[in-house]
Swiss-Prot record:
Origin species: Rattus norvegicus
Cellular localization per UniProt: Cytoplasm; Cytoplasm, Cytoskeleton; Cytoplasmic vesicle membrane; Synapse, Synaptosome
Tree of life domain: Eukaryota
Membrane protein topology class: Peripheral membrane protein
Lineage, opening ranks: Eukaryota, Metazoa, Chordata, Craniata, Vertebrata
Post-translational modifications: Monoubiquitinated by CBL and CBLB after EGF stimulation; probably on its C-terminus.
Ranges of Polar residues composition bias in the record: 513-528, 579-590
Protein name: SH3 domain-containing kinase-binding protein 1
């Protein structure tokens, strides 16, 4: 027959439920799934929630029903919390009884609800049962409650057996009424401040508030439960006069139904904290028999963390300086030795390191990894002991180690500062002793390394002019066209000088051309004339040739037409040019200016133009250069005029053809649209006719109906 004691009040919500109060005993319980049990109380049978009661074992039940004792005052400990709040019962400890499972707290935890335990690192909890996945029920410092199972580490069964054997040895060597110290919540202190009782595990309270000669003999007998909300436990103790007493179970305030309402409409929120070993809760070992390694010693996590960090420490050398842009970044200078802390940062392409006692991130392509044996050199000082504080602050030792490290860096290549312009990132340089096969992608905020310009030239170079081609050369010209114009139109001998001059001008760039307001004169005016030769015509005198009407720079539209005509009709120009030019022809062509030296030299370089110039009677003798210079200029002027007229007429014809085609397209489109509209109108007209006929028929039917009546 299963019986249970009520731990929380419950008011019946339905007819088949029981109204239970704290302290009542329910009998004839039949366990059912779903969180509800069926039992009998005060002659009435019904259902009740299983997490509002605690199952009672037979031996505990007899003690509860038979023995009662007056309440004892609560004792204050250093924390001010009331301990030993319930009365205790004395029951002789069964020597062969097995201990419960025990676990040690690995992470501190603050309770979120009333039925949860507060965990501190190093506490030992006796596990009552596993209520559900992730939550266990246990006893800690006389209080029963829930705790998260992932905040503790379970002690092995070997330690439990060792604890039992030690208790047996202690009980044999001690008086009959003496209790093992492992069952006491606090140790008693003698007159000299030493503990009177020693056992498997002792917890030390604050010495200032503990009464030295007070002894708490409390035997904690925690009953097993399948529910989760149990908080009180049945305990036994022996007073000074040996009286036996039964405890009045103290109820606990509950805000909701089931598990203390810890999962009501909210996800489970657990706040893990860093492992901090508190000296006040370190267990004390008993030297009798074997020691308890898992329960009595907890390694210092900060020490192990420091050891593992120093074992895998890497170093890198700064090859490019970088100025920190954010607070979490490091300012590194060329040649610094940075201690690597983490290569797997959130931002790809960034590493975390330490320099001069400051930690931060820096771009990985600004540094070079040092070989692994760099850390093993003998001249490095020994590692200082780890500090007790969590904040690692290395003083003069760090700077001294840094200076000694910097004495032995790998040699830097001499050609590193003089980087060529094609290299934009330091990854393209061959990196030695790198563990990564490839460089990661550039992060969004990662800067580019600076460029070193070894040529001392401006950042943007002017466009370099290529060699003079055989065909027509079409490119943008600046204000220097006036300088090139006179020499090319008047003399074929000056081609070499003009080419050298144009190359010099182009190397300077278009922005460096300075316009001149002086009028140009013919270069051959001061030369002596050959005897027996026909003087040049009046239109080719120095005054006429240097007149601003001929040598004025053309407008951009005329310049564009010159390029188009000479590019497409370079061969026609040489065929259509005549050997004799009259004054009237020159005067008629004043509006059209001669071409620039680059285009004229290209147009006259063809084989046809060269043969025509060689066969002309005016250029047969090579007496002077003054008369020969006039022939190519006049030929080119006449050919240019004809070419421009032909090009303009052809352009007009093409434009007219385009307009005709556009008009045809528009007319065709209008025809199609008109046809569609006519069809649509015809269809609508047919529909209207049908509707009208239908209405007419209906009207006739109505008339006939009216007449028949």
């Amino acid at each position: 027959m299963v019986e249970a004691i009520v731990e929380f009040d419950y008011q019946a919500q339905h007819d088949d439920e029981l109204t239970i109060s704290v302290g009542e005993v329910i009998t004839n319980i039949r366990k059912e799934d779903g969180g509800w049990w069926e039992g009998q109380i005060n002659g009435r049978r019904g259902l009740f929630p299983d997490n509002f009661v605690r199952e009672i074992k037979k031996d505990v039940k007899k003690d509860l029903l038979s023995n009662k004792a007056p309440e004892k005052p609560m004792h204050d400990v250093s924390s001010g919390n009331s301990l030993l709040s319930s009365e205790t019962i004395l029951r002789t400890n069964k020597r062969g009884e097995r201990r419960r499972r025990r676990c040690q707290v690995a992470f501190s935890y603050l309770p979120q609800n009333d039925d949860e335990l507060e965990l501190k690192v190093g506490d030992i909890i006796e596990v009552v049962g596993e209520v559900e996945e992730g939550w266990w029920e246990g006893v800690l410092n006389g209080k029963t409650g829930m705790f998260p199972s992932n905040f503790i580490k379970e002690l092995s069964g070997e330690s439990d057996e060792l604890g039992i054997s030690q208790d047996e040895q202690l009980s044999k060597s001690r008086p009959e009424g003496f209790l093992p110290a492992s069952l006491l919540p606090f140790p008693a202190h003698g007159a000299k401040g030493k503990t009177t009782f020693e056992g498997t595990i002792l917890y030390r309270a604050a010495p200032g508030k503990t009464e030295g000669h007070r002894r708490y003999y409390s035997l904690r007998e925690t009953t097993g439960s399948e529910s989760d909300g149990g908080d009180s436990s049945s305990t036994k103790s022996e007073g000074a006069n040996g009286t036996v007493a039964t405890a009045a179970i103290q109820p606990k305030k509950v805000k909701g139904v089931g598990f203390g309402d810890i999962f009501k409409d909210k996800p489970i929120k657990l706040r893990p904290r860093s492992i901090e070993v508190e000296n006040d809760f370190l267990p004390v070992e008993k030297t009798i028999g074997k020691k308890l390694p898992p329960a009595t010693s907890t390694p210092d996590p900060s020490k192990t963390e420091m050891d593992s960090r120093t074992k895998t420490k890497d170093y890198c050398k700064v090859i490019f300086p970088y100025e920190a842009q954010n607070d979490d970044e490091l300012t590194i200078k060329e040649g610094d030795i940075v201690t690597l802390i983490n290569k797997d940062c959130i931002d790809v392409g960034w590493w975390e390191g330490e320099l001069n006692g400051r930690r931060g991130v820096f771009p990985d392509n600004f540094v070079k990894l040092l070989p692994s044996d760099f850390d093993k050199e003998g001249n490095r000082p020994k590692k200082p002991p780890p500090p007790s504080a969590p904040v690692i602050k290395q003083g003069a030792g760090t700077t001294e180690r840094k200076h000694e490290i910097k004495k032995i860096p790998p040699e830097r290549p001499e050609t590193l500062p003089n980087r060529t312009e094609e290299k934009e990132r330091p990854e393209r340089e061959p990196k030695l002793d790198l563990q990564k096969p490839s460089v990661p992608a550039i992060p969004p905020k990662k800067p580019r390394p600076p460029k070193t310009n070894s040529l001392n030239r401006p950042g943007v170079l002017p466009p370099r002019r290529p060699e003079r081609p055989v065909g027509p050369l079409t490119h943008t010209r600046g204000d220097s066209s006036k300088i090139d114009l006179a020499g090319s139109t008047l003399s074929g001998i000056l081609d070499k000088d003009l080419s050298d001059r144009s190359n010099d001008i182009d190397l300077e760039g278009f922005d460096s051309v300075i316009s001149s307001t002086e009028k140009l004169s013919h270069p051959t005016t001061s030369r002596p004339k050959a005897t027996g030769r026909r003087p040049p015509s009046q239109s080719l005198t120095s005054s006429s040739l240097s007149s601003p009407d001929i040598f004025d720079s053309p407008s951009p539209e005329e310049d564009k037409e010159e390029h188009i005509s000479l590019a497409h009709r370079g061969i026609d120009v040489s065929k259509k040019t005549s050997r004799t030019v009259t004054i009237s022809q020159v005067s008629d062509n004043k509006a059209s200016l001669p071409p620039k030296p680059g285009t004229m030299a290209a147009a006259s370089s063809g084989p046809a133009s060269l043969s025509s110039v060689a066969s002309s009677p005016m250029s047969s003798s090579l007496g002077t250069a003054g008369q020969r210079a006039s022939s190519p200029s006049l030929f080119s002027a006449e050919g240019k005029a004809k070419t421009e007229s032909a090009v303009s007429s052809q352009a007009a014809i093409e434009e007219l053809k385009m307009q005709v085609r556009e008009l045809r397209t528009i007319i065709e489109t209008m025809k199609d649209q008109q046809k569609r509209e006519i069809k649509q109108l015809l269809s609508e007209l047919d529909e209207e006719k049908k509707i009208r006929l239908r209405l007419q028929m209906e009207v006739n039917d109505i008339k006939k109906a009216l007449q028949s009546k």
